[in-house]
Structures are given as structure tokens and as C-alpha cells.
Regions:
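A conserved structural/catalytic subdomain of Rossmann-like adenosyl-cofactor enzymes
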Residues: 62, 77-78, 86, 136-149, ...
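Nuclease catalytic cores
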Residues: 1-19
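Conserved catalytic cores of phosphodiester-cleaving nucleases, focusing on short active-site segments
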Residues: 57-59, 66-80, 98
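Active-site metal-binding core of divalent-cation-utilizing nuclease and nuclease-like domains
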Residues: 25-65
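Short amphipathic alpha-helical segments and their helix-coil junctions
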Residues: 79, 165-184, 273-279
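Long recognition/docking surfaces used for binding and targeting
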Residues: 194, 198-302
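Nucleic-acid nuclease catalytic cores
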Residues: 82-133
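Conserved S-adenosyl-L-methionine
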Residues: 308-429, 436-437, 449, 457-459
Length: 619
């Protein structure tokens, strides 16, 4: 006769072997928890449809928001059902049900265990990310240690997406407090956040900031901690320290931050919010540019047109895409000549670090292989802080124009970049000229055979005006066009810039007889959400990215998506010009979308159409 108690005893034995019972930061409970939050969540989670849910085991990993919930069945034939909806009869089904209820407040590992002996034991694991709608099946057939489970959760795309969603939500809340309570100026908003994050990376400040009695003494403590942090960095040039400190000291001009009122806790509360709501998400393995996210949030409340200022920050999934397109290796040296808040460099660093476990190589990557140039002093400060917080041991950033001849020579000879990524400032004249100047300069910085990738307005590669054709000719005289990807029209939502990614091999003149690859990458799977911006709601991005990357790398021609074409500077560099329409795929919805995209494009670049004139149009 089957006996479920045997299965439970085997589970206890596994817990004991993994140290669960001996770990003071782990609580193993059976059927009922003393935790009032868990009690409340399981109040109506019965497998029979009503009443209290009572899992065989509830494991709390203290100091985290992670739970394990385990359901046992004696017979392996009762391990799991095909539809996972027979909660009372099957181990996995029941564990998933409990996980659904508990995931309102926790990340939950739902574990189904069946069998009455070690030889017949079956174990399945499913992960519920907090506030998610469905679980993820983990291809793991054992109960893992606490650290293994935490690492598994941390490494999932779903957990990263959850973290990003929370960073964005917390960013909005912190910005609201800065705007309404501290009344800080627009230009200093991102500065104060980067200052707080940099100061919190100093243990002495993180442990003592709440002892400051006034806003002024707290600001002084923060600035002193930042200076100590910067001066402790090996080979950090004094000039860079001065530039950064000059920008951080600009916070002294804010009345609320220079107050001697002992009962004014607003500044302290901001630091507390950053520490509790942002800092926990920060680690050197995460490619999300959180300082860039703050910057974008602040821009949304800034007077004036963001595109008019030339400010268009690159979405996180696109900076990661660049790394895959370039197939970055641990020995590559990456440069971004217009690095902004450092988004491309962060993604490149994480891509390289993920490819080696050697501490010496990882240290070399952080210290020597990431180079950035940024002309705007405050933006330079944000980028430098961003990299330092992530363990960049040297911060090879230059506060200068990438066109500065002295800087150009120094960077090229000292760092010898092999890969370049760039999202240059976008021209306010819609003529596409200035962006192509940046592209040429970027390619000239590279070592022979290096790869240069840039995301630029699509009119730079499609315009047939003499000015733009001449600039493209200058590029092709020295460098080979490998490929162009036409990007989604809403990629930079709410800014209406329509873009393309260009990919070049440096210092190999373009052969117009050899075909380049063109991809119609208008659909990345993201949708526009009123409150969250563009999001991968339907989880399509990974599949789309694989298609884009593999098609480019393998130079594949896919009907309706990609094509190989030999081009010169006088041709249009975009898939739309050469792909044959697949009429079988056209329906009313797609036709309407195409018309809408055309009107967006024409509205954005109407001045270019007018400049071409009737005579050119007829030609």
C-alpha cells in the first residue's frame, strides 16, 4: 500500500543533507506557517477549491523574498497531470497551485515530489516570479541548495524583467519626491541620483549616513565619501576627479540640501528610498542602465522637446543586441565615442564577464577594455559613476569631443579598440549629415578588421541627397558595409525618431560587387504601454533577437525579412528598398499599420521631401 509519509521523510532527508535545518536563515515549516503573510495568502488556496491551503513543506529563505513550496505524492503516477490542473491528485499540480497564491508577495519555487524510495523518486521544479501570471518550468530534477535556487532565480530573464519593472516604478516615485519636495533643478536630478549611488558604494557612508543631523551635514558627508571613493581608484586621473566633484558640488546650490534644519528629513528619506528600492537591484551582472533610466524619467518632465536636444537614449534590449551582433569576446576592446550614461559599455562589460570565470581576466576587462568618450560634462559624470559602481576599476572615460584630434590620437594609440558601439546625437536639421560624420569618426578609431555598429536615423542611409551620398562615399572609401537593420518605428517611444542599425568592418574599403545584408527588423515584439512605455509583454523578444542575429551572422536571405544586395553610396541602404512584398501575408490590420508608419515617417522627415523637390521626385 502506498504511503505518502515515506515521500515526506525522503524530502526531509534531502533538506537535512543540503543544510536547510542547520541554516539560521532558513525556516522549514510543514502544512501551516507562522508567517502571517503566508497564512493570509494560503487562506483560500485549498486544492479542493475552498478553505486553507496546506502544503507538505513551506521553506522561507530569510532576508530574501523567495519561498519554496513542496507538495508530495507517494505514487510516481501521481507526479503531474498533462494540463497541470488536477491540484488534489498530483504533486506538481498542487505545488503550482500554492505557488500561484504565494507569488502575490514572493518569488516561489514550486516543487513536486513523488515516489517512496530514493530509486523511484521524481522531482520537478517550477518558478513563479512575483506578480506573474504563469510559472516557468525549470529543467531541474532535484531539490537544490539555497544558493543554487537563488542563483537560478537571479539568472532568469523573467526575474531580470521583474527587477527592471520595479526599478522603473521606483524611479518614478523617487523622481516625484525630488520634483515636489526637494525642488531640485532638471540638470541636477540625475546628478543627485548618481551621487547617492556612488556614495552608497562606500561602506562607511552606507553605515553612517543616517547619523547626520541636518541636510547640510548629510550632503557634506556624501560629497566627502564620493571624493574618497574616486581618489581610491587606481590610476584615476586627478582631472576626472575634479570634473566629477565639480558636478556633484553643484548640489550645494539647492536650498533644501544646504539647510541646517534638524527636523528636515526629506534628503535623508530620498537616500533611504534609493538604498532600499534601487540599491538591492544593483550588481555587476545586471546589464540594465539604471542611471540611464533615471535620466529618461527626468527627461519626461523636462521642458522642451527631447529630440530637439538630440537626446535619444538607447533601449536596454538594443544595447544587448549590439553585443550579440558583434559576437564580443573576452579579449575585445570596446569603445563608445558618444557614451551618454554608459548603456553600451555596461552591456559590453556584462557580455564579456559572462564568458569567463577567471578573476584576472574579469579584472582586466573592467580595468582596460571599456573606453568611452562624452563631450557633455554632466553626462560624463553620470557615465563615470555608472561604470565605477559596477566595478570598473579604472574608468577609461574621456570628457571631450570624439572629434578632438588629440583625444582621437590618444584613444586610438593607447586603447586600440576592436569594436565600437554608438548612438550619436541626432541632428536637429533632418539632413542626416552630422550622424554620418560621427559614424566615419567611429570607424576611423578602430583597429583594422574591427567592427563598428551605430544606430542612426534611417534617413542617413536612405536619403539620395548629394550631401548624404557624399558622406556615405567617404565612409565606403575606407570601410565595408556589412549590414543594415531597419528598426521599429516606435523604438524610442515617446520620441518619434525612426532608426536603423548600420554594421561596418573597419579599414577595408567597400567592394560594391560584394553583397551586404539588409534586414527588415521592424517588429521586435515589444508593445507600447501607457504606463510602462515599450515592453516585451508577450515574451517575443528572445525569439526575434535570435532570428535577427542568426540571419545577419549567417548572411541568410529570408522571404519578407532579409536580403543580400550589392550597393554603393548612391543606393538606399535599407531592406525596404529591395524586399519583394509577400502579398499572401497582407491583411487589413497589417495594411493599416503600414499606412500609419508611412505617415509617421513622412511627418518626421517632411522637410527632406520638400527639399528634394518636384524635379528630383519625377527623376
Amino acid at each position: 500500500m502506498s504511503n505518502e509519509r515515506k515521500t515526506e521523510q525522503l524530502t526531509r532527508k534531502i533538506f537535512k543533507s543540503l543544510g536547510y535545518y542547520d541554516d539560521k536563515n532558513v525556516i522549514v515549516e510543514e502544512q501551516i506557517s507562522d508567517n502571517p503573510i503566508i497564512q493570509k495568502l494560503l487562506k483560500s488556496a485549498s486544492k479542493k477549491g475552498s478553505g486553507m491551503g496546506k502544503p507538505e513543506f513551506i521553506v522561507q529563505l530569510l532576508s530574501t523574498d523567495v519561498l519554496l513550496v513542496i507538495e508530495c505524492k507517494a505514487k510516481t503516477s501521481n507526479h503531474k497531470s498533462a494540463a497541470l490542473d488536477k491540484f488534489a491528485e498530483y504533486a506538481v499540480d498542487g505545488a503550482i497551485l500554492y505557488g500561484k497564491y504565494l507569488s502575490k508577495e514572493f518569488h516561489v519555487i514550486s516543487v513536486g515530489v513523488s515516489g517512496e524510495s530514493e530509486e523511484t523518486l521524481r522531482i520537478s521544479n517550477y518558478l513563479w516570479i512575483k506578480e506573474s501570471f504563469s510559472p516557468i518550468e525549470l529543467k531541474i530534477e532535484k531539490i537544490c541548495s539555497k544558493q543554487e535556487y537563488l542563483s537560478i532565480i537571479k539568472g532568469t530573464n523573467e526575474k531580470k524583467e521583474y527587477d527592471i519593472k520595479n526599478i522603473k516604478k521606483n524611479t518614478k516615485a523617487i523622481h516625484k519626491t525630488l520634483r515636489e519636495t526637494i525642488k531640485i533643478t532638471d540638470e541636477l536630478k540625475p546628478i543627485i541620483i548618481s551621487a547617492i549611488l556612488l556614495a552608497l558604494s562606500e561602506k562607511s557612508f552606507a553605515d553612517s549616513y543616517n547619523t547626520a543631523t541636518t541636510p547640510k551635514s548629510l550632503l557634506n558627508l556624501m560629497l566627502t565619501s564620493i571624493r574618497n571613493k574616486l581618489e581610491s581608484i587606481e590610476s584615476m586621473p586627478e582631472e576626472k576627479v575634479k570634473i566629477m566633484m565639480r558636478n556633484f558640488q553643484g548640489l550645494e546650490s539647492i536650498n533644501k540640501l544646504s539647510s541646517n534644519k534638524k527636523d528636515d528629513k526629506d534628503f535623508l528619506n530620498i537616500i533611504e528610498k534609493v538604498k532600499t528600492e534601487i540599491w538591492p537591484f544593483i550588481n555587476t551582472e545586471h546589464s540594465f542602465d539604471y542611471i540611464g533610466e533615471f535620466y529618461k524619467e527626468f527627461l519626461s518632465y523636462t521642458d522642451g522637446n527631447k529630440k530637439g536636444l538630440g537626446i535619444v537614449l538607447t533601449p536596454n534590449h538594443i544595447t544587448d543586441l549590439f553585443c550579440e551582433l558583434a559576437n564580443i569576446g573576452v579579449n575585445d576592446r570596446i569603445i563608445d565615442p558618444c557614451c551618454g550614461t554608459g548603456g553600451f559599455l555596461i552591456s559590453a562589460m556584462n557580455s564579456m564577464l559572462s564568458k569567463t570565470d577567471d578573476p584576472q581576466i574579469q579584472r582586466r576587462i573592467r580595468r582596460d577594455q571599456l573606453i568611452g568618450i562624452e563631450s557633455e560634462s554632466k553626462m560624463f559624470t553620470l557615465a563615470a559613476a555608472n561604470m565605477i559602481i559596477r566595478g570598473d576599476g579604472k574608468s577609461n572615460l574621456y570628457n571631450a569631443s570624439c572629434f578632438d584630434k588629440e583625444i582621437f590620437t590618444k584613444v586610438k594609440s593607447t586603447h586600440k579598440p576592436t569594436i565600437a558601439f554608438m548612438n550619436p546625437p541626432y541632428s536637429q536639421t533632418d539632413d542626416g549629415g552630422s550622424e554620418l560624420d560621427f559614424v566615419l569618426n567611429m570607424l576611423n578609431l578602430l583597429e583594422p578588421g574591427g567592427l563598428g555598429l551605430a544606430i542612426i536615423p534611417i534617413n542617413c542611409v536612405c536619403s539620395l541627397l548629394d550631401k548624404e551620398v557624399e558622406k556615405r562615399e567617404k565612409i565606403l572609401e575606407k570601410h565595408t558595409l556589412l549590414g543594415v537593420m531597419s528598426m521599429p518605428t516606435t523604438l524610442f517611444y515617446p520620441v518619434g525618431t525612426v532608426t536603423a542599425i548600420v554594421i561596418f568592418e573597419a579599414h577595408r574599403p567597400h567592394n560594391s560587387q560584394i553583397k551586404s545584408w539588409f534586414g527588415y527588423c521592424r517588429d521586435d515584439g515589444f508593445v507600447v504601454s501607457r504606463n510602462s512605455g515599450r515592453i516585451d509583454r508577450n515574451k517575443k523578444w528572445e525569439e526575434k533577437k535570435a532570428l535577427w542575429v542568426n540571419s545577419f551572422r549567417n548572411r541568410e536571405e529570408i522571404k519578407g525579412f532579409s536580403i543580400l544586395k550589392a550597393v554603393t553610396a548612391k543606393d538606399e541602404w535599407c531592406a525596404e528598398a529591395y524586399l519583394q512584398p509577400d502579398y499572401s501575408q497582407i491583411n487589413e490590420k497589417k495594411f493599416q499599420r503600414a499606412v500609419e508608419e508611412y505617415f509617421v515617417y513622412k511627418a518626421l522627415y517632411s522637410s527632406r521631401f520638400e527639399e528634394i523637390g518636384e524635379e528630383d521626385a519625377e527623376a
